[in-house]
């Protein structure tokens, strides 16, 4: 059972993989780099309890189809205040399969080094997601199938409100990026985050929500 421990961020890192010296070293590196508490859990063993606020890093290199189905089912029944990130994900892992993961907040591919993982997790601790541009675009487009429970009362960041207001005047992603001096990939990531927060499926619904809830 996962003992409840918390970091200064209010989060706990749970690395789910096969026990090994390499896995232990990775966990220690992440704990030190992120100033976060953490625990290693054997991917082949069941997990009865996960503390609220947990950030779960699941090693896809050690997961066969049976284990993937087990963890998807187990994690889908857990507290909504958890975040799941896939580690060592095969480059050809289908987007539709990524979409099946509950509470998914990031995907690290097998070619990414530890520092990329650290940087991605730092973003997740700030409330961001970690996806490639193509994956973020796919998830935004298919957000109606994305199994993430959200509420309209979720607080939006200042940047998310700026982007929503740009949507209200019909701005494209490229136009939003140029006007806010950020990359188009960053715009798509912000869109994906705010779509989750306000529980909408597309830009039209986001604009409708903004018209009802935001001042210009």
UniProtKB/Swiss-Prot annotation:
Induction: Regulation is very complex. Strongly induced at 28 degrees Celsius (at protein level), transcription regulation requires c-di-GMP, although the mechanism is currently unknown. c-di-GMP levels are stimulated by the diguanylate cyclase DgcM and repressed by the c-di-GMP phosphodiesterase PdeR (YciR). Transcription directly repressed by MqsA, and indirectly repressed by MqsA via MqsA's repression of rpoS.
Gene Ontology molecular function: any one: cis-regulatory region sequence-specific DNA binding
GO cellular component terms, A-Z: plasma membrane; protein-DNA complex
HTH luxR-type domain sequence ranges: 149-214
DNA-binding residues: 173-192
Major site of localization recorded for this protein: membrane
InterPro entries: CsgD-like_REC, Sig_transdc_resp-reg_C-effctor, Tscrpt_reg_LuxR_C, WH-like_DNA-bd_sf
Keywords: Cell inner membrane, Cell membrane, DNA-binding, Membrane, Transcription, Transcription regulation
Keyword Transcription regulation: yes
Topology of this chain in the membrane: Peripheral membrane protein
Domain of life: Bacteria
GO terms (BP aspect): positive regulation of DNA-templated transcription initiation; regulation of single-species biofilm formation
CDD domains for the chain: LuxR_C_like (cd06170)
Phenotype when the gene is knocked out: No curli production.
PROSITE patterns hit by this protein: HTH_LUXR_1, HTH_LUXR_2
Cell compartments where the protein resides: Cell inner membrane
Stated role: The master regulator for adhesive curli fimbriae expression; necessary for transcription of the csgBAC/ymdA operon. Plays a positive role in biofilm formation. May have the capability to respond to starvation and/or high cell density by activating csgBA transcription. Low-level constitutive expression confers an adherent curli fimbriae-expressing phenotype, up-regulates 10 genes and down-regulates 14 others.
Name the record gives this protein: CsgBAC operon transcriptional regulatory protein
């Amino acid at each position: 059972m996962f003992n409840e421990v918390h970091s200064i961020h209010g989060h706990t890192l749970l690395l789910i993989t096969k026990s090994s010296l390499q896995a232990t070293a990775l966990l220690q590196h992440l704990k030190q780099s992120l100033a976060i508490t953490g625990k290693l859990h054997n991917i082949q063993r069941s997990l009865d309890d996960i503390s609220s606020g947990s950030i779960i890093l699941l090693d896809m290199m050690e997961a066969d189809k049976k284990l993937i189905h087990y963890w998807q089912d187990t994690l889908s029944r857990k507290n909504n205040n958890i975040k799941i990130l896939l580690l060592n994900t095969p480059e050809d892992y289908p987007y539709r399969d990524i979409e099946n993961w509950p509470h998914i907040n990031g995907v690290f591919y097998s070619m990414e080094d530890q520092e990329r993982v650290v940087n991605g997790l730092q973003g997740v601790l700030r409330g961001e997601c970690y996806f490639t541009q193509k994956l973020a675009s796919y998830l935004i487009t298919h957000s109606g199938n994305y199994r993430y429970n959200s509420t309209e009362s979720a607080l939006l960041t200042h940047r998310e409100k700026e982007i929503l207001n740009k949507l209200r005047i019909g701005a494209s992603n490229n136009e939003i990026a140029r006007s806010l001096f950020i990359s188009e990939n960053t715009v798509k990531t912000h869109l994906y985050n705010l779509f989750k927060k306000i529980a909408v499926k597309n830009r039209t619904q986001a604009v409708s929500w903004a018209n009802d809830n935001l001042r210009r």
